[in-house]
UniProtKB/Swiss-Prot annotation:
Residue ranges of domain POLO box in the record: 307-392
Full protein name: Probable cell cycle serine/threonine-protein kinase CDC5 homolog
GN (gene name): CDC5
Keywords for this protein: ATP-binding, Cell cycle, Cell division, Cytoplasm, Cytoskeleton, Kinase, Mitosis, Nucleotide-binding, Serine/threonine-protein kinase, Transferase
One of the record's GO cellular component terms: cytoplasm
Taxonomy, superkingdom: Eukaryota
Family the entry assigns: Belongs to the protein kinase superfamily. Ser/Thr protein kinase family. CDC5/Polo subfamily.
Source organism of this protein record: Encephalitozoon cuniculi (strain GB-M1)
Length: 472
């Protein structure tokens, strides 16, 4: 049942800016917040704006009043294509008026509500524009937004993103940390919630961006629960799922996983995010690899990212044991569970697959080896068995560990898909082919030694990819 909104001013009311002798007629209500209402306003020439109206009698505390003045001071100085423009502010004895750029398509939360979830190519475009706006805010004017969410990302008539609502924003001086806990529950970074002693900075916006990406692709926020305390608990544990039915690309999973890191210093920079494959890809990565193989656009060389060094089916464990070049040992079980011992040998990452409401979802957990939960103790014993049996003194590299997204059984071995879109053909006859950079770089091995990527091996890889892609 809808609740009728009490309007601060009747539709049709004319607001006069006495200093500039400009009259604004209120045409309709666009939205409302805790202390403000936003109207479509039109001047005599026919130009339209969004007018944010704050009723002063509703502001009871000095702190809220100070935030209002701070919002106006910060927002009025901002000038960027991906930030909502504030043209003017003025006030009467009862109200404060902010004349803002009109975003005809509304906010991203409304778009998501209409569509359920968005396609990756559309999300990539929205995210790229948001990142460009954040680069301006963080690097050019030292402003941290602190309430980045779908409802504060607005769309103009051409569906370009504009960051708006700077009510919780702050200017960050060199090395400064803020300690005020603020934001919207689903989007708040863990250091804002739990790190008051150490404070927070620009990285809090990057965390919120990760939540936004996930929400646009999946349809619901990653830490969604019925009550706020449970949401905060999920954020603290960094406990979220990747629903299998959403069919997320490895690039999307990789970017989200990088951003949703509880350590703010380990999150990617905005510049790194802007160059990530998720924002630049134009076609399915397997199709691009296939095309590069078909047109001989692969260059042989050493792959400098993580990949599968060794794998073997372990019937006793009902899974595939594997070793990565980074030093990760893991088992990918037949029921889609994935248990990995990190290179430091101090902790494991556990991806658990289960069926909920007829759909398969994945849960990510991390545990110290001396505190393995009872429910995965047997799986961990299996991993220890695999390590004891097949640890043959492999040579590792100091590369960033990258987890396996998918394993596909092929006629002559396994096809591994890594989170960064590197793929590995591990053939039972001892040949292994590692394709990175969407097939532009290839390393071929026979046993553990480098080998030439000859036409026969190339042909085998092409045939397998043709089958995966359904090419004729």
């Amino acid at each position: 049942m809808s609740t009728k909104v009490e309007l601060y001013m009747e539709i049709g009311t004319v607001i006069t800016d006495l200093e500039y002798h400009t009259k604004y007629m209120l045409k309709k209500l666009l939205g409302r917040g805790a202390y403000a209402q936003c109207y479509l306003a039109e001047i005599e020439s026919g130009e339209q704006y969004a007018m944010k109206v704050v009723r002063l009698k509703d502001i009871k505390s000095r702190k809220v009043h100070e935030k209002l003045e701070s919002e106006i001071a910060i927002h009025s100085k901002l000038d960027n294509p991906n930030v909502v423009k504030m043209y003017r502010s003025f006030r009467s004895s009862e109200y404060v008026f902010m004349v803002l750029e009109l975003c005809e398509r509304g906010a991203l939360d409304a778009l998501l509500k209409r569509n359920g979830k968005l396609k990756e190519r559309h999300v990539a475009r929205f995210v790229k524009q948001t990142v460009e706006g954040l680069i301006y805010l963080h690097n050019s004017v030292s402003v941290v937004h602190r309430d980045l969410k779908l409802g504060n990302l607005f769309l103009d008539s051409k569906f370009n993103v504009k960051i708006g609502d700077f009510g919780l924003s702050a200017v960050i001086k060199d090395g400064e940390k803020k300690v005020t806990m603020c934001g919207t529950p689903n989007y708040i970074a863990p250091e804002v919630l739990f790190g008051k002693a150490s404070g927070h900075s620009f990285e809090a916006d990057i965390w919120s961006l990760g939540v936004i990406i996930y929400t646009l692709l999946v349809g619901v926020p990653p830490f969604q629960k019925k009550n706020v305390e449970d949401i905060y608990k999920m954020i603290k544990l960094n406990n979220y799922i990747f629903p299998e039915n959403c069919d997320l690309s490895s690039e999307a999973i990789d970017l989200i996983t990088q951003i949703l890191n509880t350590n703010p210093l380990e999150r990617p920079t905005l510049e790194h995010i802007l160059s990530h494959k998720f924002l630049s890809k134009k076609e399915h990565f397997l199709m691009k690899i296939y095309r590069n193989l078909m047109t001989n656009r692969t260059e042989e060389g050493v792959v400098d990212t993580d990949y599968v060094l060794f794998s073997i089916p372990v019937t006793k464990l009902r899974g595939v044991g594997y070793v990565l070049k980074s030093g990760v040992y893991g088992i990918y079980f037949s029921d889609h569970r994935n248990l990995m011992l990190k290179p430091n040998r101090k902790s494991v990452i556990y991806l658990n697959s289960t069926i909920e409401s007829g759909k398969r979802v994945f849960y990510k957990e991390e545990h110290l080896v001396e505190k393995i939960p009872a429910e995965i103790a047997e799986s961990y014993k299996g991993l220890q068995y695999f390590i004891r049996t097949f640890d043959n003194g492999f040579s590792f590299l100091d590369v960033e560990p990258c987890f396996i997204v998918k394993i596909r059984k092929i006629e002559c071995g396994f096809l591994f898909v890594m989170a960064d879109s590197t793929i590995v053909f591990d053939f039972v006859d001892g040949w292994r082919v590692v394709l990175s950079r969407c097939g532009e770089r290839v390393s071929c091995y026979n046993g553990l030694g480098l080998a030439s990527f000859n036409q026969e091996i190339r042909g085998r890889c092409i045939e397998i990819l043709r089958g995966c892609l359904g090419c004729g």
